[in-house]
Amino acid sequence: MITGIQITKAANDDLLNSFWLLDSEKGEARCIVAKPGFAEDEVVAVSKLGEIEYREIPMEVKPEVRVEGGQHLNVNVLRRETLEDAVKHPEKYPQLTIRVSGYAVRFNSLTPEQQRDVIARTFTESL
């Protein structure tokens, strides 16, 4: 659990009235207001703060949306045979449009290598 604190008494005078976020699960403290000897946003072991007394500071925590290594899905509702036939007979499919990396493109405008790649990665045996 994260707790916001203001140090009210400490063996190290530089810590007086400084603000920190304490992570009780990790045993870490993050400096919110920089003091001499500590950089703003620095994370240290709680033991590095030494003997301290503090008062808890009410915190309003808003959910943070984080996107890390997200997924991208392009849905093309076609049969594999249709794309394979479009490779062999592009004149029969001048308007065949697919989604690639979020963009709509004409299948026939792709290079043969790109067409093979689309066919190979679009169709799977099972999900």
Curated annotation (Swiss-Prot):
GO molecular function, one term: formate C-acetyltransferase activity
Record-listed Glycine radical modification sites: G102
InterPro entries attached to this UniProt entry: Auton_GlycylRad_Cofactor (IPR050244), Form_AcTrfase_GR_CS (IPR019777), Gly_radical (IPR001150), Glycyl_radical_cofactor_GrcA (IPR011140)
Record domain Glycine radical: where: 5-127
Lineage: superkingdom: Bacteria
Gene Ontology CC: cytosol
Keywords: Organic radical
Protein task: Acts as a radical domain for damaged PFL and possibly other radical proteins.
Protein name: Autonomous glycyl radical cofactor
Species, as recorded: Salmonella dublin (strain CT_02021853)
Gene: grcA
